[in-house]
A protein has these predicted regions:
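Append "and occasionally in soluble cytosolic enzymes with long acidic Gly/Pro-rich linkers
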Residues: 1-98, 194, 243
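Sec-exported extracytoplasmic/periplasmic mature domains
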Residues: 5-23, 35, 55-60, 98-105, ...
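Conserved structured core elements
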Residues: 7, 11, 24, 44, ...
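Short, flexible loop/turn elements at secondary-structure junctions
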Residues: 8, 34, 82-84, 111-114, ...
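Bilobed periplasmic-binding protein-like "clamshell/Venus-flytrap" ligand-binding domains
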Residues: 15-17, 57-83, 128-135, 182-218
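Short, solvent-exposed loop/beta-turn-alpha elements that line the ligand-binding surface or hinge
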Residues: 35-52, 62-76, 122-130, 148-181, ...
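Feature representing long, continuous alpha-helical segments
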Residues: 94, 98, 134-137, 144, ...
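Periplasmic binding protein-like
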Residues: 101-155
């Protein structure tokens, strides 16, 4: 995972798929607008670091096809699953494959219909038998903030619906407990910072780029309340909105 994180070119994901307001992500995954956000190392391509992580994992040489191999001559390869019904996700997967294979990691693309995709990537739809090796995931605003927040439901292997990353690590679970037990914003922020540090160290999931949501409203009104899930059209807006 660490080798992959350094082998990808995030500038290209931002420019090919992002808007004019997109930016390169950090290793802590969650963007700066998130409650409890902590600055972590920016993601950027570093092929020397990626190669060193490959060597540390026992893949120091390449075969005639340009793929890293271990001492037994087995090439480094994994299957990348994506939802064929989401055109952008297929594009992400294709660019990941192109970049990683240029680096020396073989990627087999597995494009599935929505039901088959869910059955390989979700605890609920796989009956707690997730079988994918890696996947292009779509995150919702609600999912990012659900339960303990910071996309943790997608990482936590014990989550009854999501849990795609299948993480059961004790340190990770202890951090989630601290977030859930926080009684003040300060306590939550401290625990959230620990989770982002954990993400950065272990890279269970990798953000390809960060982008912005642009909300349009009538110029005749101001003091809208912005909600991450419902945008401007949310209950709190009706208590804050004023006419100019």
């Amino acid at each position: 995972r660490l080798a992959v994180s350094y082998a990808l070119d995030y500038d290209s994901f931002r420019t090919v798929f992002g808007s004019a307001y997109a930016s390169n992500p950090n290793r802590g995954f969650v963007p700066p607008v998130t409650v409890g956000y902590k600055e972590t190392e920016a993601l950027g391509q570093d092929l020397d670091k990626a190669a060193q992580y490959m060597a540390d994992a026992g893949y120091a040489e390449k075969n005639a096809d340009g793929f890293y191999v271990n001492a037994d001559g087995e090439s480094c390869a994994f299957t990348l699953t994506c939802n064929a019904g989401k055109e952008a996700h297929v594009g992400y997967a294709e660019l990941v494959k192109t970049q990683l294979e240029q680096f020396g990691i073989q990627v087999v693309l597995e494009t599935l219909d929505a039901d088959s995709y869910n059955a390989k990537t979700s605890n609920k739809f796989s009956e707690n038998n997730i079988t994918m090796e890696a996947a292009i995931y779509g995150y919702t605003a609600a999912g990012m903030g659900m339960k303990n927040g910071l996309a943790s439901i997608y990482v936590d292997g014990t989550h009854p619906v999501q849990g795609g990353c299948q993480v059961f690590d004790e340190e990770f679970q202890a951090i989630l407990s601290a977030m859930g037990e926080a009684k003040t914003v300060e306590e939550y922020t401290a625990a959230a910072g620990s989770l982002q540090d954990w993400y950065a160290a272990h890279m269970p999931l990798i953000a390809l780029y960060w982008d912005s949501q642009i909300l349009v409203h009538s110029a005749a009104y101001e003091n809208f309340t912005v909600d991450a899930v419902f945008g401007l059209n949310n209950a709190n807006t009706w208590f804050s909105i004023t006419a100019k």
